[in-house]
Amino acid sequence: MSSADARTAPTLVSLATAVPPHAVAQTEVRALVARMFAGSEAGSARLLQVFDHSGIAQRHICMPLEWYLSDRSFAEQNALYVEQALALGAAAARAALERAGLEATDLDHVVFLSSTGIATPSLDAHLSLALGCRPECRRTPVWGLGCAAGAAGLSRARDLALADPRARVLMVAVELCSLTFRREDLDKRNLVATSLFADGAAAVVVQGAQAPPPPRTPHRP
């Protein structure tokens, strides 16, 4: 990168994450799944080894482990997604803003990414209201990119800050993978997904090269 490019390049100012309160050991999840998938191909000892070789010791989920033992309708799971995704996204966003020395009113654009639930209006609208963003703060919802969402969101935030060098952009990604679990789905793919994914949120603040200094002293944990 040339010195001229460096002077005009956007900056990633801060990063923060948030996880739900329920932490579960991989051994706990394995035992639960073995019981639920008993008698199916996915519940065989051979396939259950995916839990042992995942490299994961502990994950966070948004509900107690026992909650997943009961059948849940899509409406119930999605309503919980909206509630929990908003809470986690807001927690990560507030932490990222604090680390950047910013208030929500300093933001010019909010980019929100998720794939594990749906909402209309989309959650970027709910999040902007919850944070207290200015009415003219623009929003971009991105849905359905799965594991690629974080990279795509950062690219979008960079493009926005490059187009408006004075802009401050908040990007928030939230996934509640546990709420997509269907206990009646005995397919191997459901087993593998259950062995890998969890719930959480991440937020970053990206700003253009000409963004004014933050109104507060950035907090570095």
Where are these regions (language model features)?
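Condensing-enzyme catalytic core mediating Claisen C-C bond formation in acyl metabolism
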Residues: 1-83, 177, 183-221
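Membrane helical hairpin/interfacial module
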Residues: 74, 111-112
